[in-house]
Curated annotation (Swiss-Prot):
Its main location: cytoplasm. GO terms for molecular function: UTP:glucose-1-phosphate uridylyltransferase activity. It is found in: Cytoplasm. Belongs to the UDPGP type 1 family. Its EC number is 2.7.7.9. It catalyses: alpha-D-glucose 1-phosphate + UTP + H(+) = UDP-alpha-D-glucose + diphosphate. The gene is UGPA. GO terms for biological process: UDP-alpha-D-glucose metabolic process. Pfam families: UDPGP. It comes from Musa acuminata. UTP binds at residues 83-86, 97, 160, 189, 220, 358. This is UTP--glucose-1-phosphate uridylyltransferase. The keyword Nucleotidyltransferase applies. Keywords: Cytoplasm, Nucleotidyltransferase, Transferase. GO terms for cellular component: cytoplasm.
Length: 467
């Protein structure tokens, strides 16, 4: 049955002239793997907590060389790759998410460029920046990178694969059914970074320049900066793959974790966990760390494994609906590739290396006095004594960046804030200070204005009379 489905799908895909032969064969092989049901269930009893040899505490890494020349040699072996396929739609923005303004008028991409530029300048090295775009972000990104033409940085862009969405009903590609637009296609997750790096020719180009490692991270993680200590450790220990993990907080209970399984280190995602063990997976006691998606990978190893077609990561089925048609997109994650590499490790890094901006509540954190901007680096304010960030919940009125910005005359001071919950039609004046636990809920149809200079400490506000 599966064979007949694949044969039928293959002939339909062969007709799709929008994509390359590599993309066609990659897609067919992904669907074949999915249909053969080779997603093995994890045997819960075989899971072991990784030792410090496998997940190395950051503090135990030996210090990097101090002289500039030795550091330059290390950095000349590195390329930085940012995953740039996502759109800013969830935050109400058009175009690539990486061009949302984060702070002081700088976008994610601006900050990334400034950081690498200052590294290249300081050490006289040439760390190139690669942006992996999707067909959703490619055209915009090409225009945007032109503004860095005079920067001291080589920028390369390439596209990740473009696969057709599958119609659930008959397992045929959506574009074959008259869906000519972008919604007939999807980018198959960031696990696709490895074949795309190879197919684009970028991998061989990097190897010919003497590069040995690529540091891969989400473009919206402001904490994912080049770390010489980590690079030095990987080169000295010949680790082909390193995943940065960090201690879980209650906000991260769904994040993937590293386990030792049948003698290899591997990523365990919540989707792979048998129902009976989901609560155990979420517990901070047993699974103490989670994947930041900051990954350091050896380029020769990527080439070897892609050529051998050995990177068979767990498939993540992602059902969607397009114009009332139920479709399926099959995806893979880059972190799941860890088990195919030799001497793969995790490094348990400080939380500061994980500062993602997924929603406007995160934007509030990074635009506030909780952080400072120094040479393109977003650095936490030392005046904050609590190691964890305040928890922030903003209502739907704040969901889009434009609405969020218009509702704050200036971003409040939150250095001493523990939690903030805002719902309804709330507007903040200039120079507001929030401390402790603050909850502000405007009743339906009521506009609630927090006046300039207001100091709210451990307050529950349901109407103007409570301010």
């Amino acid at each position: 049955m599966a064979d007949a489905k694949i044969a039928k799908l293959q002939s339909a895909v062969a007709e799709l002239n929008q994509i390359s032969e590599n993309e066609k064969s990659g897609f067919i092989s992904l669907v074949s793997r999915y249909l053969s049901g080779e997603a093995e269930q994890i045997e819960w009893s075989k899971i072991q907590t990784p030792t410090d040899e496998v997940v190395v505490p950051y503090d135990t890494l030996s210090p990097p060389p101090e002289d500039l020349e030795a550091t330059k040699k290390l950095l000349d072996k590195l390329a930085v790759l940012k995953l740039n396929g996502g759109l800013g739609t969830t935050m109400g923005c058009t175009g690539p998410k990486s061009v949302i303004e984060v702070r002081n008028g700088f976008t994610f991409l601006d900050l990334i460029v400034i950081q690498i530029e200052s590294l290249n300048k300081k050490y006289g090295c040439n760390v190139p920046l690669l942006l992996m775009n999707s067909f959703n972000t490619h055209d915009d990104t090409q225009k945007i990178v032109e503004k860095y033409a005079n920067s001291n940085i080589e920028i390369h862009t390439f596209n990740q694969s473009q696969y057709p969405r599958l119609v659930m009903e008959d397992f045929q590609p959506l574009p074959s059914k008259g869906h000519a637009g972008k919604d007939g296609w999807y980018p198959p997750g960031h696990g696709d970074v490895f074949p795309s790096l190879m197919n684009s020719g970028k991998l061989d180009a990097l190897l010919s320049q003497g590069k040995e490692y690529v540091f891969i991270a989400n473009s919206d993680n402001l904490g994912a900066i080049v770390d010489i200590k980590i690079l030095n450790h990987l080169i000295n220990n010949q680790n082909e793959y390193c995943m940065e993990v960090t201690p879980k907080t209650l906000a991260d209970v769904k994040g993937g974790t590293l386990i030792s399984y049948e003698g290899r280190v591997q990523l365990l995602e919540i989707a792979q966990v048998p129902d009976a063990h989901v609560n155990e997976f979420k517990s901070i006691e047993k699974f103490k760390i989670f994947n930041t998606n900051n990954l350091w990978v050896n380029l020769k190893a990527i080439k070897r494994l892609v050529e051998a077609d050995a990177l068979k990561m767990e498939i993540i089925p992602n059902p969607k609906e397009v114009d009332g048609v139920k479709v399926l997109q099959l995806e893979t994650a880059a972190g799941a590739a860890i088990r195919f590499f030799d001497h793969a490790i995790g490094i348990n890094v400080p939380r500061s290396r994980f500062l993602p901006v997924k929603a406007t509540s995160d934007l509030l954190l990074v635009q506030s006095d909780l952080y400072m901007l120094v040479d393109g680096f977003v650095i936490r304010n030392k005046a904050r004594t609590n190691p964890s960030n305040p928890s922030i919940e903003l209502g739907p009125e704040f969901k889009k960046v434009a609405n969020f910005l218009s509702r704050f005359k200036s971003i409040p001071s939150i250095v001493e804030l523990d939690s903030l919950k805002v719902s309804g039609d709330v507007w903040f004046g200039e120079g507001v200070v929030l401390k402790g636990n603050v909850s502000i809920a405007a009743k339906s149809g009521v506009k609630l204005e927090i006046s300039d200079g207001a100091v709210l400490e451990n307050k529950v506000i349901n109407g103007p009379e409570d301010i």
